[in-house]
Amino acid sequence: MSHPPKLRLGVNVDHIATLRNARGGRAPDPVRAALLAIEAGADGITAHLREDRRHIRDDDMARLKAQISRPLNFEMAATEEMVRIALATKPHACCLVPERREELTTEGGLDVVGQHNALAPAIARLSEAGIRVSLFIAADPAQIEMAARLRAPVIEIHTGGWCDAITDGHHDKADAEWQRIVAGARQAYAAGLEVHAGHGLDYATAEQIAALPEIRELNIGYFIMGEALFVGLAESVRTMRAAMDRGRDRATGATA
């Protein structure tokens, strides 16, 4: 069977901004982290401008767009304010995510079935501006079907449930979540969607999911930044890249 294309790695720099904001000031700089990640092998940079600006700030997004040499993936809620900022920033891509002020991190996927009427105008405006829109959703058949109907070209499968089950030692749940991801990736690919994945991935889970030929990109931040405390950012990015490449070497099919 044919071999799928190289799997792209998007490195999320939100947690560099979290550390900076814990004390105030300008250091550590998420743009510097992005540049180092690209030098170490990242194919793109992801950053989430939340409504409460708890980590990434408006000027971070502007500087990332101006200074990095790889695609910028702008994570955002589908609000009027964020659409306006995205249209002004003109990133390569916007990933629409759910957002609640009380959450520590994005806890679930978008409910595109329940919110399709609100999402459709945002998707249309961003797409008309030449920005590639992705929807961060669970590997649920109804959500994937609606994502295709909304004509967003990309979905990002939320892998948090699978990763958490592995970490907690819940093997049956992990297996069930994994099968959902496999089925969801196949369904989305068959519907003509480009498939990305992210949330909670580490070296082992990134290597495993890299073997799914339908998946084109992984977006990973927290684990890479945590490992960077011990081995350095460049080394953690290189090790993640190597893990993904090992997994990809086991993938066959889905070459289009």
From Swiss-Prot:
Pathway: Cofactor biosynthesis; pyridoxine 5'-phosphate biosynthesis; pyridoxine 5'-phosphate from D-erythrose 4-phosphate: step 5/5. The record marks E156 as: Transition state stabilizer. It catalyses: 3-amino-2-oxopropyl phosphate + 1-deoxy-D-xylulose 5-phosphate = pyridoxine 5'-phosphate + phosphate + 2 H2O + H(+). The active site is at H48 (proton acceptor), E75 (proton acceptor), H199 (proton donor). One of its GO terms (cellular component) is cytosol. Its EC number is 2.6.99.2. It is an enzyme of class 2 (transferase). The keyword Cytoplasm applies. 1-deoxy-D-xylulose 5-phosphate binds at D14, H15, R50, H55, T105. It is found in: Cytoplasm. Keywords: Cytoplasm, Pyridoxine biosynthesis, Transferase. SUPFAM superfamilies: Pyridoxine 5'-phosphate synthase (SSF63892). GO terms for molecular function: pyridoxine 5'-phosphate synthase activity. It comes from the Bacteria. GO terms for biological process: pyridoxine biosynthetic process. Its main location: cytoplasm. Pfam families: PdxJ. 3-amino-2-oxopropyl phosphate binds at N12, R23, G200, G221, Y222. Catalyzes the complicated ring closure reaction between the two acyclic compounds 1-deoxy-D-xylulose-5-phosphate (DXP) and 3-amino-2-oxopropyl phosphate (1-amino-acetone-3-phosphate or AAP) to form pyridoxine 5'-phosphate (PNP) and inorganic phosphate. Homooctamer; tetramer of dimers. Belongs to the PNP synthase family. This is Pyridoxine 5'-phosphate synthase.
